[in-house]
Amino acid sequence: MAQPLCPPLSESWMLSAAWGPTRRPPPSDKDCGRSLVSSPDSWGSTPADSPVASPARPGTLRDPRAPSVGRRGARSSRLGSGQRQSASEREKLRMRTLARALHELRRFLPPSVAPAGQSLTKIETLRLAIRYIGHLSAVLGLSEESLQRRCRQRGDAGSPRGCPLCPDDCPAQMQTRTQAEGQGQGRGLGLVSAVRAGASWGSPPACPGARAAPEPRDPPALFAEAACPEGQAMEPSPPSPLLPGDVLALLETWMPLSPLEWLPEEPK
């Protein structure tokens, strides 16, 4: 009698608690003609390790985050459309302003440059305006070369004033202004030094009574008597070696009016 190729399985192994219907049996020690591991259908169940996709049920709930994502997308689309609309409005306003400015510029172009019935683009209008302005500058002698030539001529002639047609940064005008500022500073320093020298030499202050007094009135007379005592005699100050006589006379006779002389004259 022929022996079976595979030994019979023991009943204890088949009824073992460690191996259920979802477990696969271990392979036998001997090589059988066919594999003991057959398809899952032969065992009547699927392996526990293999994931099985459960079919979708008709009553299942959706993810709660899905509606919020939809609302956010709708809101962002509305914001984007509003921003695009505002940008379009700004661009339209800018183009209208530019067209209005070019229309005003074309009004100043003569018919010989821009005929009345001829339509011009923005670039053509700007080019014609530039050419017309250059032509007027050349006719009036206001070109850059003419202005520089005039500045050089006036600078060589030693004119004290700058060229009235030149801008503020004209070389001749800047040189003239620098010389005038230097002379003014020198005069100011000389006057300040003269005043300081006169004060250091101690020339006595002038008395208001020495000047030609106005009509005799009581308050000025009292002020003059208080300022110049009877025993004090006004003597001319000695000439200073640092100041000429006319400067000293001017400094001695100059004095601000007294507060009493500021009062208005009473009607008689």
Swiss-Prot record:
The further comment given in this record reads:
The N- and C-terminal domains are separated by a 2-repeat G-Q region.
Q: Does the keyword Membrane apply?
A: no
Cross-referenced InterPro entries? bHLH_dom (IPR011598), HLH_DNA-bd_sf (IPR036638), Mesogenin/MesP (IPR040259)
UniProt domain bHLH: residue ranges: 82-136
Please give the function described in this protein's UniProt entry.
Transcription factor. Plays a role in the epithelialization of somitic mesoderm and in the development of cardiac mesoderm. Defines the rostrocaudal patterning of the somites by participating in distinct Notch pathways.
Q: Name one GO biological process term.
A: positive regulation of hepatocyte differentiation
- Tell me the organism: Homo sapiens (Human)
Comp. bias regions, Low complexity: 66-86
Please state the gene responsible for encoding this protein: MESP1
Q: Which UniProt keywords apply?
A: Developmental protein, DNA-binding, Notch signaling pathway, Nucleus, Repeat, Transcription, Transcription regulation
- Segments for region (Disordered): 17-93
- Region: 2 X 2 AA tandem repeats of G-Q; residue ranges are 182-185
Q: What SUPFAM superfamilies does this protein map onto?
A: HLH, helix-loop-helix DNA-binding domain
Q: Where are the sequence repeats?
A: 182-183, 184-185
Give the chief site where it resides.
Answer: nucleus
Sequence motif CPLCP, residues: 163-167
List all Polar residues biased stretches: 36-48
Where, subcellularly, is it found? Nucleus
Protein name per Swiss-Prot or TrEMBL: Mesoderm posterior protein 1
Q: Superkingdom, according to UniProt?
A: Eukaryota
Q: Cellular component terms, GO, for this chain's entry?
A: chromatin; nucleus
Tell me where the signal peptide lies.
none
An example of a GO molecular function for this protein is: DNA-binding transcription factor activity
